[in-house]
C-alpha cells in the first residue's frame, strides 16, 4: 500500500465526515496499492475506514494480490461477495462509493442495508490523484524523457 496516498484519502474523508469508503475502480486501487487487478465481472473492492482496518475484497483467481500490504478477504465465484463485504461495513454510518462501481454491486449493498446512506466518494480519490507526489513526478519525468528519445 502507498500509505501516504491512503492517508490523504482518509484526511479528505474526515473533512467530509465520512468514516468508510468502498473503492472499486482498478486504476484507483492500483494508485493506492501499487498492484493492478483487472477483475472483469468479478467483485473487487478496497474498503477504507478511519479505524485503519482496511480490507481488499478480491477473487481467489488473482493470487498475486496477496503481495498487497493490507488485509485481504478472499472471494470465489460460489460466494455472495456483496454479502461478505456487507459484514464489514458499518451499517449505521454513511458509505462513500466510487463512481465506477457497477450497479449490480451497489444495489446489492443497498438491499442489504449495509450503510445509513450512500454518497459519491469519487471526488475524494480524484482530488488526491490530482496532486502528484515525488514518486509520480519522477516517473512522469522519466516517461517524458523516454518519449523524447523515441
Residue spans for each PLM region:
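A composition/biophysics-driven feature that prefers long, compositionally simple stretches
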Residues: 1-149
